[in-house]
């Protein structure tokens, strides 16, 4: 008999506390302005809050259906048709999840088998690779290069093999703030049309797109959407990240497999929040239609305030993130620079290398501009002093 605790063998031994948690803790410790984690410092729509309170008061406090509240799924179907010219079946094609990250995990788990290869574009959101690993998959990474982070389709085609099972893309792209165009989806289809390859399109920033052509969705591509999962987030759209409500749209056979995983992860999602979101989609569709201008103004406030700094600003076509090059300021690597920036100058940012598996030689950091104007101007004032 031993008193030593039984320690499990880690399935993810290379992972620890995320950089986002680390930088937010460091920001709090040094009372820094937090432009690191991607959440607003302002509240969401008053109408949405009122509808949540209404449904709580009306007793909608028990489990929702596993697939999501019917009214919300129907509202999502109508919105999808309005935006992308395709109406998914509310009963068989749409699943409401506990945030977009759960949708991503459930979709990856449903589609990836042991030994399957999954192509990801680096820099990439940090939840993809662990989910792939837990399903026994192998991540094949394609590095996108600054400042434009475009896909080289010849290089992509060379990555394909008989074991390629899935491609994960993200548009608008976190952290690079670039967007896919319809030509990119056409090129993707040309590359995978002859293969049994699925697609997950992470479109959580679909309504924060500043490009002239607007958001290009996999759901607007007739061939790709037959083998694709589109993932979206109400938290990003309505400035309510703490509600953790997202959804995915996929053809019925794929959705059926996703739901098998979803029912044993969370089973169902916050009932009054779903009902409130259904009300919001029906009553105020102009909210998400106004988001590009809303966040473009915030982007421009930060960009204009940084014009006289020594930071080089990279193009920002979407999301609420901005990349800046600090080569003229410091020779530190990006992790050390972010620590120094937080401790010595009171601004927290995210190093871009944490989004990449391979060594990242560029001196780039990510700033979040989903903040009040006063927050952005105060941060810019400190950054101009570098």
From Swiss-Prot:
GO terms for biological process: biosynthetic process. It is an enzyme of class 2 (transferase). It comes from the Bacteria. It catalyses: a 2-oxocarboxylate + L-methionine = 4-methylsulfanyl-2-oxobutanoate + an L-alpha-amino acid. Pfam families: Aminotran_1_2. Its main location: cytoplasm. CDD domains: AAT_like. GO terms for cellular component: cytoplasm. Shows aminotransferase activity with methionine and histidine as substrates, and to a lesser extent also with phenylalanine. Homodimer. Belongs to the class-I pyridoxal-phosphate-dependent aminotransferase family. This is Methionine aminotransferase.
